Amino acid sequence: MQNIYLISEKEAKKLLKELADKIERYNHAYYIENNHLVSDAEYDQLFNTNLKLEQKFPHLILENSPSKKVGAKIANKFAKVTHQAPMLSLSNVFDEQDVKDFVDRIKNFLRLNEFAPIFCEPKIDGLSFSAIYKNGLLTIGATRGDGYIGEDMTANIKTIKNFPHKINNAPEFLEVRGEIYIEKQDFFNLNKEQEEQGRDKFANPRNAAAGSLRQLDSSVTAKRPLKYFVYSGGATEQNIASSQNELLKKLKEFGFRVNEISKLADSEEEIFAFYEYLKTNRENLSYEIDGVVYKLNDFALQNRMGFIARAPRFATAHKFPAIVGQTKLLSITVQVGRTGTLTPVAELEPIEIGGVTVSRATLHNFQEIIRKDVRIRDYVFLQRAGDVIPQIIGVDIGKRSTDATTFNTPLFCPSCNSKLHYIPEDIIIRCDNVLNCPAQNYERIRHFVSKNAMDIEGLGRKQVEFLIDKGLISNPLDIFLLKEKNEASLTKLENMDGWGRKSVENLFKNIEESRNVSLPRFIYALGIRHIGEQNAKLLAREFESYNNFISQIELLSKNDSNIYQKLNNLEGIGDKILVDIINFFDVKENIELIKKLGEVLNIEDYKETKEHSSLTGKIVVFTGSLPTTSRVEAKAMAEKLGAKVAVSVSSNTDLVIAGVDAGSKLKKAKELGIKIIDEEEWLTIVNNV
């Protein structure tokens, strides 16, 4: 990444936009899908780069800046819960100087002459929750969500062993906040059970805890070994205590589990000593921690310090450095993904890092192998920092043997033997044999049945692989014909290895239930490159119904310029994504598959809660800087009133709202004779509606 102190304003503007998009994607994966896309260290580096750029160019801060947000927007499976007080994130520090700066900021802000006691406690690597008690009874349990609105998990939280359903001598209203987690040994046992049952293994204990809690069926959660600690009283903590250490004593009296490993530090030296103690002993703990949390102990002083957009000023998290180990690289295998992208994976001599046995590590892409000069039979340095797959960060050249061999970048697909396509701008190699590559087909079906797509439980990796190998399915449509095919077959599925009557009955039941699917989930399930859940929702909002969707994409496949322009105007669908959409529907087999799926599924029309107004169905464009309203707020207003917000002006545009320094869009609107108004007129329309 460029030196931010030498970066120009133009470059900074572009980079801030890229960082906001990237961090939003990682946040959604982490908080909603319970999935790490990047290491904690890489995420922190991106976030800190964003902060430093904003400090240098404060006038470039975006409305959707990561520094203003916590978590990610919640999914639609669970009821929404508005938090009494925001569940904010914590800022991070990484070394002693950062900690000293944190302490100095407290002193300077409060104008203190001496050290203010700091409460230190382990940072549990789990899932944050809030629990509300009214008259001593647990009434609401919720996840953090986006920090302001979480998901109602009351029934599931009640299944956690020893979680109080009723507390004595409690105030009329009480909130507690904490972390739900799974211990290391329980995680190992759970993954062993998942593997034996042919289900996907969890990537790490946090992922397992989050996935276990976010179950629609609370009986599934009840079977998972979830534990919890509380560390905060949320909106009510200052009603029952005057400091953090006093609060934890009180919560313990109420019957909650609090972490006994903590320290009230009276000096910087005591802070550093506690940090070193935990860093040294973390592997001896039964649960995962990834740092130490420091909080100003006195609540009155906390009140004076207050908050910034996404975090309190009075607290921070001192992250541990990534755990590094060394082992031998035995070979490099190549995986082919759903969209044909090839990824190199290092096969390693097993090594234990941070209590987890590691035998594989990502090499990201083939350029990385060349850049790091990684060779087969090298001794490599391995880093694990909460990653789904640990990373190779370097090679011990001093240990390189004469039989270490260079890895040759493949020219042909390891699955179908097709010639590969190198895409320099994306630093990727891709197999373009979309229809006949077995690996791509397998990954496409896996994506189709996944939780956020068709959500067909009972079709894990092993089951999909088995059904493909036996010739029982070869595409998503076959899944819905499987029961009929099984009934007509002499060799029943329930009599095959790994199956039984009950598991087959459950599978067919789950397949049947999945036939009712929303349009956004259906579009996402198709596996179009670069169409994640958010973009699938954008397309569903545009097409509104399955019938309209299929008719429009058929026109798009015939190069209809109106459909192209309509999609190109959608905010969030750029040129690159539009090319991927066109490429997908250029394949006639894809359109035929979608038509056949439409015959066996009940695809629900897209419905979005919006007010009916004179703007309903109108296409509006904002251009220039609005004097009193942010672009994000203006867009939200328009969409709430039923309008569609486009990013460019065309003959389909109904209204242009022009602000200060409006440029080419305003000019084009005048040329096309489109109605143009200023912000004042726009707000009048909104207020009248």
From Swiss-Prot:
UniProt protein name: DNA ligase
Organism: Rickettsia canadensis (strain McKiel)
Function: DNA ligase that catalyzes the formation of phosphodiester linkages between 5'-phosphoryl and 3'-hydroxyl groups in double-stranded DNA using NAD as a coenzyme and as the energy source for the reaction. It is essential for DNA replication and repair of damaged DNA.
Family, per entry: Belongs to the NAD-dependent DNA ligase family. LigA subfamily.
GO molecular function, one term: DNA ligase (NAD+) activity
Keyword list, A-Z: DNA damage, DNA repair, DNA replication, Ligase, Magnesium, Manganese, Metal-binding, NAD, Zinc
NCBIfam families listed in its UniProt record: dnlj, PRK07956.1
Gene this chain is encoded by: ligA
Catalytic residues (UniProt): 123
GO-annotated cellular components: cytosol
Reaction it catalyzes: NAD(+) + (deoxyribonucleotide)n-3'-hydroxyl + 5'-phospho-(deoxyribonucleotide)m = (deoxyribonucleotide)n+m + AMP + beta-nicotinamide D-nucleotide
UniProt: NAD(+) binding residues: 40-44, 89-90, 121, 144, 179, 295, 319
